[in-house]
Amino acid sequence: MTKRISAEEKLNRKPISRACVFCHEKHLQCDVGRPCQNCEKRNIGESCRDNVRKVRKTRGRTPRSGVMNLRRARREHEDELAIATKSRGAGEPGSTGLPQVPSLSTLFDANVDPVIDEELLPATYVDPLGPSDVELPTSGAESFGSVWASSEYTKLNEILGSPGIERPRKHVPSKYEPFAVPATAEHSPSPSTPIELLQDHAGLLFRNTLRRHISLDTAQSSYQASTQDTQASTVASSVSCEGAQFPASEAEYTSPYSFRQLVRSPEDLYRHQNSIFPHNYRQAYLELLNILRARFLSAQDEIAREEGPKQLHSIAQSIKTYYAPIFVTLTSNLIESDLKMHELILQRTLLEYENMSKMVNCIPMCIWRRSGEICYVSNEFISLTGFSRRELLMRRRFIMEFFDNHGIVDYFKLFNEYLAFSSKEGFSSTSDGQAVFSECNLLMANNSFLKCACIWTVKRDSFNIPMLVMGQFLPIFDMDHT
């Protein structure tokens, strides 16, 4: 073992610049003599020599001469600055020699000399325009470098156009705005009826002025037609059912019941994947608009007729404020192949949900698309409501048809604000933001309503776009205590 040394010896020892090979390997305190004392004690003084250090890699490093030149140049520059500061301080009495920091008002004052002389800046850093000449693009002549910049500009214009916020100047509609309105209608009053407001807001989901495939409505005919760009100008007028130009959906629409007869397993799905096209959400929303119009504006009950327009206005406002802006942003870069993949993933997920409901005894369950179209109902749901499977799945049916008026308003509020994109907090929901708990009145086959506690779970795709909503309903039986 190595001999222990006292504290005094440790203090008297002085470090050396380079140890011998033996002391370096054994991590011993070496001395300047050769051979050193450690090697002499071990009778290996013949082999005692200085340890050779490894040469540092100099690749990518500045040569020593270059470093010295840089240091010398920096030192000369500092000396020049010091001389200039002293001369300036000598000419101004009371100056402390410290650099004067300009205020914010000085920085934005065009009449004051710039803080940095433009002659010292490279040509690429000199702004060719003055501070007053720079402004945001407001006309269609300008172009953005990316779709994301265009979408962000659209959202800013949308914020400026919100109620209660006055615009500082007249705004000209741009080709980058997916829901731009004419300039003459900038200060026009709001629609006189809630259905006009709903049609106006529903148009936000159908227009595709940013890109060819930005909207919800990519029907099967979009794969065959080559005149899609020429139809963009007429999409706004097609929101109303009277002037709508769309194919006969009943002839092309494949009901969930018929589709399940053809595709019963994942193998069948991939075998017929070339025959699967993106879902026609545009036609679905138009039919949903007719249902909401009939429910809220054509009610026979006097109280329902009075509250109907207000409730319809609330639904439209919820779609416009919470759902449409985020949806347009997420779908701005989607192409036809993405929409087809979206439909394939939806059908594959639906098969998994169906198998899950058959393997376990679950509470009544119903699955529908983001548009509200029912895709699947469990046996327990059929037993609870009294409707047959063919009644629910043989034609296009919406989950809103089985709620009362207040339930429809609550559903749209929960879906748009909390469930679709998990964009809002503060409601009773799961930690991952994919499910919410609520109550609703569910329609029975005898036209009566049954109060149910429900949980709505959303399934999103890789683009964070909602595909399916799974609703589970647990009946609540009120017991009368007498």
From Swiss-Prot:
Its main location: nucleus. The keyword Zinc applies. Residues 20-48 bind DNA. GO terms for biological process: cellular response to starvation. GO terms for molecular function: DNA-binding transcription factor activity; DNA-binding transcription factor activity, RNA polymerase II-specific; RNA polymerase II transcription regulatory region sequence-specific DNA binding; zinc ion binding. Residues 350-422 form the PAS domain. The keyword Plastid does not apply. Keywords: DNA-binding, Metal-binding, Nucleus, Transcription, Transcription regulation, Zinc. GO terms for cellular component: nucleus. It holds the Pfam family Zn_clus. It is found in: Nucleus. Gene3D superfamilies: Zn(2)-C6 fungal-type DNA-binding domain. It comes from the Eukaryota. Belongs to the ERT1/acuK family. Transcription factor which regulates nonfermentable carbon utilization. This is Glucose starvation modulator protein 1. It comes from Eremothecium gossypii (strain ATCC 10895 / CBS 109.51 / FGSC 9923 / NRRL Y-1056) (Yeast). The lineage of its organism: Eukaryota, Fungi, Dikarya, Ascomycota, Saccharomycotina.
